[in-house]
Amino acid sequence: MIVVGVENDENFCRIRSQKYLFGDNKVLFVSRYPQSADLREWLIKIPNRYIHFGDFDLAGICIYQSEFYKFWGDRASFLIPEDIEERLKSGNTGLYDTQYLRYKNLKIIDSRLNGLVGMIHHYGRVYEQEGYIEKCAY
């Protein structure tokens, strides 16, 4: 079973409409909020892989690297959907501009993120995870 940490509470509350992002994998969704060390301490005790489902922006990448990848290395990964480049093309420029000053020198320690970070800077846009919530009837 793969543990998926969901950064945004709206996404967590409507997680069924985003299950498609994880294919046929058996997953356990957990909320990153409220922020505390409890989730990290629990993850340390179990052998499962961890996927971080957060915003596709520099702040989200910073959160993932400092709170998860730092502790588990390649046992942790950042969800990068197949269509993220198309979504970034029409993403949020204002949020990118706001974050750029703070995170422009962000050191990427998980090399699997180099492509995503390159796209973010290339388009000068970010994409919030709420965009992956599909409309569906429960």
Question: Which residues make up each language-model segment?
Answer:
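Active-site cores of enzymes that catalyze phosphoryl transfer or operate on phosphate-rich substrates
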Residues: 3-10, 117, 126-127
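Glycine-centered small-residue hotspots that permit tight backbone geometry or close packing
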Residues: 59-61, 124
